[in-house]
Amino acid sequence: MSSVVETVTDLVTPILQDHDFYLYDLEFVKEGKSWYLRVYINKDGGITLEDCALVSDELSEALDNVEPDPIPQAYFLEVSSPGAERPLKKEEDYQRAIDHYIHISLYQQINGQKVYEGTLTQLSDKEITLDYLDKTRHRQITIDRQKIAQARLAIKF
């Protein structure tokens, strides 16, 4: 399966670069009896449905022209946005999230909390700094990145 991901990544990257898009994530998974090739794309300012359709058409054509077929079994191709509350997986994801509202889940509590939501203000190799609201007071916390179980963009209400 990793060779499928690598092959598709190699195929889709120039397509995305031609349109000033970038690859957010790619997965090839089996759900029930069906296989799915999911390609998550984005661009500065956000991706549109038309952008997804364009990449889907171009990638589908590119996949059809590869010999030998990198995906011999039947599969569904899905090209989409990673979503408004997308996970932060790679370093670039964290870089793009600076000055954005994020949700952080920790492995262990810090100051009695395992979950924080706030604005990511600083980022280094070892830690992040988050501005968050504690009841009615603005506070700042610096969290060791190794203590983060999960991070994603969040919608502020």
Curated annotation (Swiss-Prot):
InterPro entries given in the database record: Ribosome_maturation_RimP, RimP_C, RimP_C_sf, RimP_N, RimP_N_sf
Record keywords, A-Z: Cytoplasm, Ribosome biogenesis
Highest taxon listed in the record's lineage: Bacteria
Coiled-coil ranges per UniProt: none
GO terms for cellular component: cytosol
Keyword Cytoplasm: yes
Chain segments annotated as transmembrane: none
Location in the cell: Cytoplasm
GO biological process, one term: ribosomal small subunit assembly
UniProt xrefs under CDD domains: YlxS_C (cd01734)
HAMAP family on file: RimP
Protein's name in the database: Ribosome maturation factor RimP
